[in-house]
Amino acid sequence: MRSYSNPENGGQINDNINYSEKRPTMLPENLSLSNYDMDSFLGQFPSDNNMQLPHSTYEQHLQGEQQNPTNPNYFPPEFDENKVDWKQEKPKPDAPSFADNNSFDNVNSSKLTNPSPVQPNIVKSESEPANSKQNEVVEATSVEKAKENVAHESGTPESGGSTSAPKSKKQRLTADQLAYLLREFSKDTNPPPAIREKIGRELNIPERSVTIWFQNRRAKSKLISRRQEEERQRILREQRELDSLNQKVSQAFAHEVLSTSPTSPYVGGIAANRQYANTLLPKPTRKTGNFYMKSGPMQSSMEPCIAESDIPIRQSLSSTYYNSLSPNAVPVSSQRKYSASSYSAIPNAMSVSNQAFDVESPPSSYATPLTGIRMPQPESDLYSYPREVSPSSGGYRMFGHSKPSSYKASGPVRPPNMATGHMRTSSEPTSYDSEFYYFSCTLLVIGLWKRLRASPQDLMCFYSPPKKLFAYLIQFQGIQYRIEYSFFVIESIHVFRVEEPLLNELSATASSRDKPAPNEYWLQMDIQLSVPPVFHMITSEGQGNCTDFTEGNQASEVLLHSLMGRATSMFQMLDRVRRASPELGSVIRLQKGLNPHQFLDPQWANQLPRQPDSSVFDHQGRNPPIQGLSHDTSSEYGNKSQFKRLRSTSTPARQDLAQHLLPPKTNTEGLMHAQSVSPITQAMKSANVLEGSSTRLNSYEPSVSSAYPHHNLALNLDNTQFGELGTSNISYPLSAPSDVGSLPRASNSPSRPVMHPNTQGINTEIKDMAAQFPNSQTGGLTPNSWSMNTNVSVPFTTQNREFGGIGSSSISTTMNAPSQQLSQVPFGDVSLATENSVPSYGFEVPSEESVYAQARTNSSVSAGVAPRLFIQTPSIPLASSAGQDSNLIEKSSSGGVYASQPGASGYLSHDQSGSPFEDVYSPSAGIDFQKLRGQQFSPDMQ
């Protein structure tokens, strides 16, 4: 732009000024500017003779609306600059069109001409000056040419190209080439170019292919390493979670056991309803009662029974049983009145109607407290075994730790603990690191109810040596269920290896963490109880006792618990239990050939307590060795001569506690045979159960090998016939009664049948067995061999010591009790017989060819064994792996009364509410057993 002069008259500008598109292109010649304006253009700011620049609009200049062009400051009178819209939008130019050559010529800025269809030109807008600088020529390829070029390059058919670019065939490496590359990769994962070229020449492949293979191999190796690390972290995380869960459960159990509630049915404060001092568990919002056994229709196991008393415990007679064992367990200040509102599952000599009684003074008809002997109570200062968590063991290691340096097995012996009979050395530790210990248990079988450990929450088994307690923990749908029982109610423990077909099923179903190691094997432990366990339930609302949550109340009716797990964990648990409770260790029996020492630390295995010999049992008037697994005394925890256990002279002599748990002896005239009369027989006399009957009983005395009471009442029937009730409590819990074939565990003698009380009421005639053994010592197997016409419960018992073998005695049982005595019997599971029927017991009678044939009768008793395992994790509380349609489980009926008085027939079932057990011979299953209590049994009742 030219420089402007500043004449005195204001000066005139004749040049074209193009400030913007909104400014006029041509300014009038007479446009005068003030000195201020000119100085403003020149960058100077004078202070005199200021004049305003006229504001002529763009439209006025274009349209020539100025009437006086000589006077630039003149505008029409009607012009109002305030109403002028100074913001004007730029007109949009027409969209340009492109010709084939798409060439742009120089355009004129004064006019915009329409483009030619052949060679369109884009001219400048009218707002541009005519003599402005010409724009540069932009040459571009037309859209059509661009499309054609792209189509030609992509190989479209229009351009004549191929539809797909040719791909080179992928070269596959041979096995030799791959092996060579793997060897080189093991030497160096990223070789230099010289090595890669050498490899390419050796394998006759391009060096580029070698480079790519090494890259892919490094990526694959990194991926494999990352996955392995993730799997390792996952396993460690799961193990930490399991250990944390075990620790929390142990703490919760310890808090509950340490509760000082005075209303405990167990000795040592193991309460059925505790003061809820446990901070890990919620406080209950309602009172719950503990019912071991419910007669009448089965109730829902999900809902705890509400207690009738203000303190919701002692609702079953088993609480009285426990309190009678330990009179000092409850202080005098806590004496309360409780109501026995249900019949007990504990066998008693007679029934007692509902009445109130004191905890400290139980009625004599139930039990009489001991006065001269204080029963064992758990103590917390017996032993101390440091706990150690091992991921490989799946739980707490019992004896995998190093022995404490202060422990000396040969130290001086202290006076024995009169409460437990335990002898400890002066240098033995006196505190526990943890009171509850976890041991591996993959499968739990109680009767027909099974629980498989598919996850850690499905089944967790604990034991507490200081508290003398076993516990099973089961979690289902957010509810925690627990089964507890004390060491003092364990009659016997039998241990043997798991055989086929259960072995394959367990190996195929168990999780990897629960499977035995290559040098291990599966172990089965059968625990026989004398009373049912205690059941607990913990929900978000609270915790407390509940009813039996197992299907069909199997845990209340069947007192045999079968636990399957790894041998190492089982033997370590048994070793610790034996040390904590020598009396319980004296009833542990091992299968011949089992060697627990290979799974225990030799430093601890050398201190194993010794087992009593069978001669000691016979000499002291106890039961002979139990049949089956324990008939060979050399199999009891090793060699008999090496581990022979002798009772210490400082330990209190064992006593038959059943004598103290029976009613007074009265009216014994003319009731029993001239041979030895047991206290239980005398109790039956005093209860008038046998009043007016001419009966010869094969009496039963509880086994005192464990120094704790067994059943209060048990009868051995005629042992001259094809079976006897008290033969053995080894019951082969996982052998199917319907199978006929060799079993993995043989019985004691080919001529001695093995008794199997069974919950399965299989309708098999006795005449089949009689045809197989017509002239054996079993007495011909006549259907009328047994005849009982009284309502007597026959529980699961041990072998009688007085009448050991079949044919050794001619004592028979013929009991003719009056019908009114039926109302006094407190049991719902009774077996009656007529001339054409027999009581319900299953037998396995071995033949000379070692073939076990089963004889099953027409009813059942509630002391049974489990059939062979049908692997399936059940649900809690009302589910079982033994479905009715299972081909491994025979359909059966449980807990009924076979009415066999003259003129009466039918199966009296007290479970009419969807029980999984089927009444296989139930012509009159509609009779309610509950209505029969307190009433005379009428043959016309159908």
From Swiss-Prot:
Keywords: DNA-binding, Homeobox, Nucleus, Transcription, Transcription regulation. Residues 153-164 have a biased composition (Low complexity). Residues 1-19, 61-73, 99-116, 122-135, 604-614, 630-641 have a biased composition (Polar residues). Residues 142-151 have a biased composition (Basic and acidic residues). GO terms for cellular component: chromatin; nucleus. Residues 1-54, 61-80, 87-172, 604-651, 892-922 are annotated as: Disordered. PROSITE patterns: HOMEOBOX_2. Pfam families: Homeodomain. It is found in: Nucleus. One of its GO terms (molecular function) is DNA-binding transcription factor activity. One of its GO terms (biological process) is cell differentiation. This is Homeobox transcription factor phx1. The lineage of its organism: Eukaryota, Fungi, Dikarya, Ascomycota, Taphrinomycotina. The gene is phx1.
